[in-house]
Amino acid sequence: MGGRRGPNRTSYCRNPLCEPGSSGGSSGSHTSSASVTSVRSRTRSSSGTGLSSPPLATQTVVPLQHCKIPELPVQASILFELQLFFCQLIALFVHYINIYKTVWWYPPSHPPSHTSLNFHLIDFNLLMVTTIVLGRRFIGSIVKEASQRGKVSLFRSILLFLTRFTVLTATGWSLCRSLIHLFRTYSFLNLLFLCYPFGMYIPFLQLNCDLRKTSLFNHMASMGPREAVSGLAKSRDYLLTLRETWKQHTRQLYGPDAMPTHACCLSPSLIRSEVEFLKMDFNWRMKEVLVSSMLSAYYVAFVPVWFVKNTHYYDKRWSCELFLLVSISTSVILMQHLLPASYCDLLHKAAAHLGCWQKVDPALCSNVLQHPWTEECMWPQGVLVKHSKNVYKAVGHYNVAIPSDVSHFRFHFFFSKPLRILNILLLLEGAVIVYQLYSLMSSEKWHQTISLALILFSNYYAFFKLLRDRLVLGKAYSYSASPQRDLDHRFS
């Protein structure tokens, strides 16, 4: 009830949980510890609101014990790219069956055909360009493996040089020869449809490039009228941006080769900096997955259809269905490679250190002690803080996140449970397999039966690896959950 503060009304202090700079340092072990918060404060009496802020003098930031997961086998980059290229070739092959199938089983009274495909209608130059585009990652992995630097024998260095020279020469010659033929045969609109995804490839990936290092946007924003006219400066800035984008793209192209590490520290500012870096790295990997999967599905499902003659009949519904199947399957395979178990565990550790805040209605906690949030404090679980005229409740064991930062909340939501990404991939791949099995049983056309049967094999292999990782990691995290509960009860 409202009223004037009388002489017998108790006044409570609103000191912060810890002084700025009191929580710092780092530890390289798997167990993190934090000092006991010893600020004296008492909670106000709660008038039936159901919310309470625990006495901070008895609160302890519970130490985290990170789970040691087993090292699961990671597929080599060149083998993974070969597997992905083989799956895309299968999808391209079954689409060509859908487009150029024949009626070879008809009697001679009908238009006969001695082959199952109309090979005379297939443009092999277009097929060559499509194959090179689909195999760009595999070609890049071969060149990278053949460009290894170090102490190698003379025979091995000559062999690597010949391999790199042969692959690049054969790819460049085949691509140039096929493109010249296509430029002479088709219209400008067809060629634009063929090549325009590459015009969006670098700019799309460039959006996530760390341009703060190059200060490109700051430089462009501060340019005067005379500098803006200078074409040389623009070209240099654009080339610099392309170089940084391509460097980051090639670093992430082969997944586990460049895996970030986790610094198990107690400094709130360092924890937030680590989370920002991991967010950038994760967004880049997801962008690589999105671009690669859409590009593969585009060249498998849409490009062959666009260059078909108007008088030629094909199943348009099956082409659209194949586009969805290829894009989803490629996305799952790439995410499984770019987001391995060790990387998901790293994100989980960072989310556990970051913590999370839950927004609370101020009317429900008007009689509960609310501490002003400070960025250098490590807040224990259950504490109420006031930030930006709102009230938040600490949810995690460690809580160093900014309460009003939505990106911190999303990061903790996705990665607080280490198996969440793996479960999503497993459910998605399982749904695709169930749909393909249903389509296979209900299919009445021979080319669709062959297509679904071939595509299913690649999805079976991806599903097997996901299920294996899920079972192994599920056991590992369940074993580590019981000691953590005992530790929580000991400090509570």
Swiss-Prot record:
Residues 28-53 have a biased composition (Low complexity). May protect the cells against DNA damage caused by exposure to the cold-warming stress and facilitates tissue damage repair during the recovery phase. The chain crosses the membrane at residues 77-97, 115-135, 153-175, 185-205, 288-308, 322-342, 421-441, 447-467. Glycans are attached at N8. It is a multi-pass membrane protein. This is Transmembrane protein 39B. It comes from the Eukaryota. It is found in: Endoplasmic reticulum membrane. Keywords: Endoplasmic reticulum, Glycoprotein, Membrane, Transmembrane, Transmembrane helix. One of its GO terms (cellular component) is endoplasmic reticulum membrane. Belongs to the TMEM39 family. The lineage of its organism: Eukaryota, Metazoa, Chordata, Craniata, Vertebrata. Residues 1-54 are annotated as: Disordered. The gene is TMEM39B. Disulfide bonds: none annotated.
